[in-house]
Amino acid sequence: MSLALEQATLIQENLPQGNSLPRHIAIIMDGNRRWQRKHEQFCQKRAISGHRQGADSIPQIVDTALHLGVEALTLFAFSTENFSRSKSEVAELFSLFNSQLRSKLSFLHDREIRLRCIGDLSKLPQELQNNIEQASSATAHYSRMELIFAINYGSKDELVRAFKELHQDLASKKISVNDISEELISSYLDTSGLPDPDLLIRTGGEMRVSNFLLWQIAYTELYVTDVLWPDFTANDLLEAIKTYQQRSRRGGK
C-alpha cells in the first residue's frame, strides 16, 4: 500500500462515523506565490517555482479524496484575471499545465479518474487545448471520481457564455421562455452534469470566493485555511471535512 493510501486509510478511520461526506469538493488553490516568496532562498529563480511546488501537492489530495469516496474534486488552476499577469509568467504556467497533463495521464488511468476542464478553453494556446482534449477523451469512460480543473475560468464569464448560448437556443426556438428554470440554466454552465459543490476550501487565508463557481456555491459550505496551497496536505483536507461534517446544512431554509 502506498504512503498516500495508508494516510488516506488513517484519515477515513478518524472521520466522524455516520456523518455524510461531501460528494463534491471544490478548492481555490491560493498561496503559491506567497509560498515562493517565503522560500525564495531555496527556490529556483523562476516566476512559477511556487506553482510547481503547488502542482506537486495535487496527487496526494486527489488520492485522499478518491479513497474517501468523494465523487468530484474541482481545482481552480487559472482564472480569467490571471491573463493580466506578465506574458512570461503566463507562458510558464501554460508550459507547466502542458507538462502536468502529459506526465500525470498514467496517474489518472491507474486510478480510473475522469478528467474534465472547465472555463473558456478557446483562449488557451492550441497545444494546451489539444492536450486537454486528448487527456479528457482518454479518461472519459472512467467513473470512480471526476477531477475537474478550472482553467481560464471566471464565473461571470461562464454565465455570460451560458446566457449567449441560451439566447441562441431561444432565437432558434429550440427552447421557449417557459422552459427557463434554475435546472435549465445549470445545464448551460461548464459544470453541467456535476452536483453543486458541498464544500469549498480556500487555502492561503483570504476571505473571498474570487469569481469561482458563483452560481454553483449558493448553498455550499465554505472553509478557509491559512495554510498555503503548496503546504496543504491530506491532514488539512481531513480537517476541512471534519469541520464540514460538524455543520448543519439547511440549504437556505
Swiss-Prot record:
<feature type="binding site">
    <location>
        <position position="35"/>
    </location>
    <ligand>
        <name>substrate</name>
    </ligand>
</feature>
<comment type="function">
    <text>Catalyzes the condensation of isopentenyl diphosphate (IPP) with allylic pyrophosphates generating different type of terpenoids.</text>
</comment>
<dbReference type="GO" id="GO:0016094">
    <property type="term" value="P:polyprenol biosynthetic process"/>
</dbReference>
<feature type="binding site">
    <location>
        <position position="83"/>
    </location>
    <ligand>
        <name>substrate</name>
    </ligand>
</feature>
<comment type="subunit">
    <text>Homodimer.</text>
</comment>
<dbReference type="InterPro" id="IPR001441">
    <property type="entry name" value="UPP_synth-like"/>
</dbReference>
<keyword id="KW-0479">Metal-binding</keyword>
<feature type="binding site">
    <location>
        <begin position="208"/>
        <end position="210"/>
    </location>
    <ligand>
        <name>substrate</name>
    </ligand>
</feature>
<comment type="similarity">
    <text>Belongs to the UPP synthase family.</text>
</comment>
<feature type="binding site">
    <location>
        <begin position="31"/>
        <end position="34"/>
    </location>
    <ligand>
        <name>substrate</name>
    </ligand>
</feature>
<dbReference type="GO" id="GO:0004659">
    <property type="term" value="F:prenyltransferase activity"/>
</dbReference>
<dbReference type="InterPro" id="IPR036424">
    <property type="entry name" value="UPP_synth-like_sf"/>
</dbReference>
<feature type="binding site">
    <location>
        <position position="51"/>
    </location>
    <ligand>
        <name>substrate</name>
    </ligand>
</feature>
<feature type="binding site">
    <location>
        <begin position="79"/>
        <end position="81"/>
    </location>
    <ligand>
        <name>substrate</name>
    </ligand>
</feature>
<dbReference type="Pfam" id="PF01255">
    <property type="entry name" value="Prenyltransf"/>
</dbReference>
<keyword id="KW-0808">Transferase</keyword>
<keyword id="KW-0460">Magnesium</keyword>
<feature type="binding site">
    <location>
        <position position="202"/>
    </location>
    <ligand>
        <name>substrate</name>
    </ligand>
</feature>
<feature type="binding site">
    <location>
        <position position="221"/>
    </location>
    <ligand>
        <name>Mg(2+)</name>
    </ligand>
</feature>
<feature type="active site">
    <location>
        <position position="30"/>
    </location>
</feature>
<feature type="binding site">
    <location>
        <position position="30"/>
    </location>
    <ligand>
        <name>Mg(2+)</name>
    </ligand>
</feature>
<protein>
    <recommendedName>
        <fullName>Isoprenyl transferase</fullName>
        <ecNumber>2.5.1.-</ecNumber>
    </recommendedName>
</protein>
<dbReference type="GO" id="GO:0000287">
    <property type="term" value="F:magnesium ion binding"/>
</dbReference>
<dbReference type="InterPro" id="IPR018520">
    <property type="entry name" value="UPP_synth-like_CS"/>
</dbReference>
<feature type="binding site">
    <location>
        <position position="85"/>
    </location>
    <ligand>
        <name>substrate</name>
    </ligand>
</feature>
<feature type="active site" description="Proton acceptor">
    <location>
        <position position="82"/>
    </location>
</feature>
